[in-house]
Amino acid sequence: VQTLQQVENYTALSERASEYLLAVIRSKPDAVICLATGATPLLTYHYLVEKIHQQQVDISQLTFVKLDEWVDLPLTMPGTCETFLQQHIVQPLGLREDQLISFRSEEINETECERVTNLIARKGGLDLCVLGLGKNGHLGLNEPGESLQPACHISQLDARTQQHEMLKTAGRPVTRGITLGLKDILNAREVLLLVTGEGKQDATDRFLTAKVSTAIPASFLWLHSNFICLINT
């Protein structure tokens, strides 16, 4: 099933997304859930944490997966995806270390891709992937190009991505990222795409044509049979 839902504002989008996440967790307490980071899913995660505490949901068997990470930044720096997930998911939920499958960020090479991919496979694959639409149409750090890599890989960051809000605190240029590939994302049993935020109208319009193109990596989600998109633009 492919569902496209227009939502009136960011708050409503985040509320609905958190309910969706909670439903997945309730139906499969040992779910493996891949999480994007950044401004788009921030309020969704806040609401999710709130609901889990209020409703005393058992999360002891859950596993979260970090979708991507900047390369060459120490993991503990403010702008990393790791710091984001630690602050907004891991610490508020009191997760054990083994409940987050996570890319390291320094001295990265392709063996890091193998390590993370193998850990996901051992858990039985992704049940849900939560994604945001990038200003240039990227998914994770799968950047637009003439061709896209299906598997987990180290990517060269698009010029627009190098100006990402999260990197404003980096204090140095960041030109590479490590990310799950499009095949990894499309292999998830369900995909939830959140489309919100300023400067994304062009990417949103191109995505909504439903024409699959390597120039808009997010367009590959139209190939997924169990895909929900919440839009507020």
Regions found by a protein language model. Give the residues of each.
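Glycine-rich N-terminal segment of FAD-binding domains in flavoprotein oxidoreductases
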Residues: S27-H53
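Class I SAM-dependent methyltransferase SAM-binding "motif I" and its flanking Rossmann-like core
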Residues: N136, G140-L182
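Glycine-rich beta-strand-to-loop/alpha-helix junction loops that act as flexible
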Residues: L35-T40, L131-K135, T196
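Active-site histidine-anchored catalytic micro-motif
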Residues: V57-L67, L75, G125, L139, ...
